[in-house]
Amino acid sequence: MAFPDTDVSPPRGGPSSPAKSPLLRSFKVKTYIPKNDEQNWVVVDASGVPLGRLATLIASRIRGKHRPDFTPNMIQGDFVVVINAAQVALTGKKLDDKVYTRYTGYQGGLKTETAREALSKHPERVIEHAVFGMLPKGRQGRAMHTRLKVYAGETHPHSAQKPQVLKTQPLEVK
């Protein structure tokens, strides 16, 4: 709709719309979205490293908190390969006192096992359980689970990705 004496249409919006106020036009918000085009791979040797310290290091690398452009709503972390999971250290009496529980889905199907039993049967699950507890719960956390690869022994099939070795501090025996 044009005014009768001009060919200019009226500005849209209310009295405080950015089209009318030159002051509000200068306060435009710019959102920075970092690019996630690099896929870094990291190898961590778990032999002799305390489980909690190892899990916090891995969780922060998967989440991407080590990056200067960390954005909480984007997955920008590294892929982490953990080797020697069977030799992870548990301090104190945790080998016998720490209990892992799972439910089979049937009545009376609550299964429990100590950390010693879990490390002897499937050491990968002990590290995965500790790391997954430190990642976000929800859709983004489930997507981060695929970035963790845990192996009980020394070898891993991810050498084609050329992973960098991440230094860890083994437990000092006193």
Swiss-Prot record:
It comes from the Bacteria. GO terms for molecular function: mRNA binding; rRNA binding; structural constituent of ribosome. Signal peptide: none annotated. Keywords: Ribonucleoprotein, Ribosomal protein, RNA-binding, rRNA-binding. The keyword rRNA-binding applies. NCBIfam families: rplM_bact. Transmembrane segments: none annotated. This is Large ribosomal subunit protein uL13. InterPro entries: Ribosomal_uL13, Ribosomal_uL13_bac-type, Ribosomal_uL13_CS, Ribosomal_uL13_sf. Part of the 50S ribosomal subunit. Contacts proteins L3 and L20. One of its GO terms (cellular component) is ribosome. Residues 1-22, 153-174 are annotated as: Disordered. The keyword RNA-binding applies. It comes from Deinococcus radiodurans (strain ATCC 13939 / DSM 20539 / JCM 16871 / CCUG 27074 / LMG 4051 / NBRC 15346 / NCIMB 9279 / VKM B-1422 / R1). GO terms for biological process: negative regulation of translation; translation.
